[in-house]
Amino acid sequence: MDGTPGHDDMPGQPAPSRGESLWAHAEGSISEDVILAGARERATDIGAGAVTPAVGALLCLLAKLSGGKAVAEVGTGAGVSGLWLLSGMRDDGVLTTIDIEPEHLRLARQAFAEAGIGPSRTRLISGRAQEVLTRLADASYDLVFIDADPIDQPDYVAEGVRLLRSGGVIVVHRAALGGRAGDPGARDAEVIAVREAARLIAEDERLTPALVPLGDGVLAAVRD
């Protein structure tokens, strides 16, 4: 015995639940290289959101499983999620990433260059995602990743499903909203929008969905 108090011995510090322990283990099990760490630091500096390492690893896996030749991303941030997606894509795969903030796109371009990713492998588009997505071709993407304002999730989901080829995957981050999405008493605009996006996916007979408890909730679905 070393005399160090455990969770049960520390006043005011209840032991974490099993779910909390599993989440902490999953989130702490993934390490990032110096390129990703730098992109994450820049994202923090400018207040841009970034997926957790565990969500990033999931994106890499899904990009690889889906074929990873053509991927679309809504919400570039500083390039953290883009780096993870590209790491799972084919060597000739192209990431199309959309953000309304020029500074986000600049930092993402910097991150991709630092990772040795050539300009032919990325297409960075500045603009409102609702408008840009309508210009992308039907059934042309292996994966569509949505990590943007929860209010707009229903619009992005509708367009994202249209973009998927057969066997393609749509991935929606911030599907839990810190647990509020599953709280029957929560009825604010963000919660309503996130629930509507989840309903659109659940009721689409072409999709097979699953909700993954990583980051702020990841809703993924594969198209038949």
Curated annotation (Swiss-Prot):
Highest taxon above the source species: Bacteria
SUPFAM superfamilies in UniProt: S-adenosyl-L-methionine-dependent methyltransferases (SSF53335)
Record-annotated active site: 173
UniProt record, GO biological process: methylation
Keywords, comma-separated and alphabetical: Methyltransferase, S-adenosyl-L-methionine, Transferase
Signal peptide: none
One matching Pfam family: Methyltransf_3
Basic and acidic residues bias: start-end ranges: 1-10
Record has RNA-binding as a keyword: no
Keyword Transferase annotated: yes
GO MF annotation, one: O-methyltransferase activity
Cofactor note: Does not seem to have metal cofactors; no metal ions were found via inductively coupled plasma atomic emission spectroscopy, and the residues that bind metal in homologs are not conserved.
EC number: 2.1.1.-
Gene Ontology CC: peptidoglycan-based cell wall; plasma membrane
Binding site residues for S-adenosyl-L-methionine: 51, 75, 80-81, 99-100, 104, 129-130, 147, 156
Additional facts recorded: Was identified as a high-confidence drug target.
Functional summary from the UniProt entry: Probably specifically methylates an O atom of its substrate.
Family the entry assigns: Belongs to the class I-like SAM-binding methyltransferase superfamily. Cation-dependent O-methyltransferase family.
Assembly behavior: Homodimer.
Name listed for the protein in its UniProt record: Probable O-methyltransferase Rv1220c
Taxonomic path: Bacteria, Bacillati, Actinomycetota, Actinomycetes, Mycobacteriales
